[in-house]
């Protein structure tokens, strides 16, 4: 099956990036948010990112206009998905929220429509069970910033069909992404490796081993990381990091995945990183 029209559920950081790459590659996109102000904000972010691409001569002005004209915004999930070939959900890492959304999507989307989640850690099989089409359900984990990062983790659930997998793999390549197949385990590959490293870096601060800037300097200068783990945590969002650590901890029942108490306190205090202007570092 060829994917000609997509619905993206959620216009936040990941959702607007996913919308951007589909629209820029000639695929019509229905983007839904909870209200029109948030939908307009997502569209504005996409336009700003396209403007940067025009300035850097990666695309021309006509391509920018064509991309924006390929996007239609909605505030009703049911209206968004009624005529699409693929739905990509990109809401926060909360199982109950995703389950509720996919129950609505499953009822409203055409029978042929593939349902994909951008979850970075939650079981694909578990979310798929909330629908009547687990064979058409799959994980499609993009990376931030979506227009730049080339990787997509493709995650089959217990009942995902080979046809569904092949369609999503082909679609990922059409988006100029590299699809990597991974099994349905908590955190998949990316976050199972990355998040414990970030969590351990937070423990270094929590236990007084080193200051945040020094922890990051060690990893950048000594391990050739382009960005330190604490700066990266701020960029991702400390709330997101905590959600993923909780999924790992609950999924594996292994104390090595226990979230650092400092991470929990910072999230409770609303210091979430870039998005709030303060995390391990301060931002304008």
For each predicted feature, which ranges?
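NAD(P)-dependent Rossmann-like dehydrogenase/reductase catalytic/cofactor-binding core
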Residues: 2, 27, 162-166, 173-184, ...
């Amino acid at each position: 099956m060829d994917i000609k029209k997509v619905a993206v559920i959620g216009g936040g950081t990941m959702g607007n990036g996913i919308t951007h790459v589909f629209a820029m590659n000639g695929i019509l996109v229905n983007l839904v948010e909870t209200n029109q102000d948030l939908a307009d904000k997502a569209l504005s972010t996409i336009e700003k990112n396209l403007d940067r691409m025009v300035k850097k001569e990666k695309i021309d002005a006509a391509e920018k206009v064509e991309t924006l004209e390929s996007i239609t915004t909605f505030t009703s999930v049911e209206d968004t998905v009624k005529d699409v070939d693929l739905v990509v959900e990109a809401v926060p890492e909360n199982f109950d929220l995703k389950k509720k959304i996919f129950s609505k999507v499953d009822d409203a989307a055409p029978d042929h429509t593939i349902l994909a989640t951008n979850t970075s850690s939650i079981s694909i099989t578990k979310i798929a069970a909330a629908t009547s089409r687990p064979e058409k359900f799959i994980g499609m984990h993009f990376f931030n910033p979506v227009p730049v990062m080339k990787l997509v983790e493709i995650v089959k659930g217990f009942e995902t069909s080979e046809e569904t997998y092949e369609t999503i793999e082909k679609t990922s390549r059409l988006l100029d992404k590299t699809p990597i197949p991974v099994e349905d385990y908590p955190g998949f590959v990316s976050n199972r490796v990355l998040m414990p490293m970030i969590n351990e870096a937070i423990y270094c601060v929590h236990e007084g081993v080193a200051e945040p800037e020094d922890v990051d300097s060690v990893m950048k200068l000594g391990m050739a990381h382009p960005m330190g783990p604490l700066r990266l945590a701020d960029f991702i969002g400390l709330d997101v990091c905590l959600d993923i650590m909780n999924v790992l901890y609950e999924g594996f029942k292994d104390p090595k995945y226990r979230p650092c108490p400092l991470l929990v306190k910072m999230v409770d205090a609303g210091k979430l990183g870039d998005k709030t202007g303060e995390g391990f570092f301060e931002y304008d």
